[in-house]
């Protein structure tokens, strides 16, 4: 299967200039999981102008092609945005940092938990990562593994 994270943005570049300054640091955006951001770049007047800015291919795709037993069940992860970086987990338990502007992979950490074999539940699934920061100079991306 081919999984892609698709990021859309308005063709009005000036309107999206401040979007890079807004983080989405947790699932649901805040401790209350409101899933809301007070942004005004996309509205009823320009939503029809949205276009694909970039696509990101999950590294799980290559693993699934090399060994069909490693094919994920689905892609259910929600990325976090910290600064100009998206952090995401893949169904096979990899963690990626992605440049939010151009979709290029900055780094990838492979836990190799898929080496333990397919889980007996619904197969390979992963829902995301968590972020912690001391508010100064230390930051941690946390991900529970599939095994």
Regions found by a protein language model. Give the residues of each.
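Short loop/turn segments that connect beta-strands within beta-propeller blades
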Residues: 100-102
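Repeat-blade elements of multi-bladed beta-propeller folds
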Residues: 24-28, 70-94, 120-147
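Charged, amphipathic alpha-helical interaction segments
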Residues: 15-16, 84
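Bacterial N-terminal signal peptides
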Residues: 6-15
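Aromatic (tryptophan-biased) beta-strands that constitute blades/sheets of beta-rich domains
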Residues: 20-70, 74, 104-118
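Positively charged n-region of N-terminal signal peptides that target proteins for export
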Residues: 1-5
């Amino acid at each position: 299967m081919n999984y892609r994270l698709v990021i859309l943005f308005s063709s009005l570049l000036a309107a999206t200039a401040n979007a890079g300054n807004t983080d989405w640091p947790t699932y649901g955006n805040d401790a209350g999981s409101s899933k809301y951001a007070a942004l005004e770049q996309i509205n009823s007047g320009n939503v029809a102008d949205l276009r694909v800015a970039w696509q990101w291919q999950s590294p799980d795709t290559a693993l699934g092609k090399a060994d069909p037993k490693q094919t994920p069940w689905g892609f259910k992860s929600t990325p976090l945005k910290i600064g100009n970086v998206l952090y995401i987990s893949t169904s096979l338990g990899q963690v990626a940092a992605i440049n939010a502007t151009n979709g290029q992979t900055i780094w990838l950490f492979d836990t190799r938990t898929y080496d333990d074999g397919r889980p007996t539940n619904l197969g390979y699934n992963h829902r995301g990562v968590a972020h912690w920061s001391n508010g100064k100079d230390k930051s941690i991306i946390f991900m529970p593994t599939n095994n």
